[in-house]
Amino acid sequence: MEDIRWQQRFQNFQRAFALLREAMEQDFHQFNQLEKEGVIQRFEFTFELAWKVLKDKMEHDGLIIDQISPRAVVRLAFQAKYIPDAEVWLRMIGDRNLMSHTYDSAKFEAV
């Protein structure tokens, strides 16, 4: 039986990304605090799906992933040419970590 986990996760990612895009097409500065927190939550959820899709796809293609972490997966995905720019992904990891571990309204607005 063919492993379709990466395809199922990719479909979930596409749905999550569409919801994030919908939110980002609005004027973020007009959002109330709860709405802003919802957008950040959508970003975090979408990013989690994104790096896990990369991991699942690379494993499906036979790549050996020694370390299962977002940074390790992104670096391998870049080396294996699954993504064109690791820096953008690494910044997203930093943004996600910043929002997960701190609360600073200025940083919140910047992300």
PLM regions: where:
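Solvent-exposed interaction patches of small proteins and small membrane subunits
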Residues: 1-111
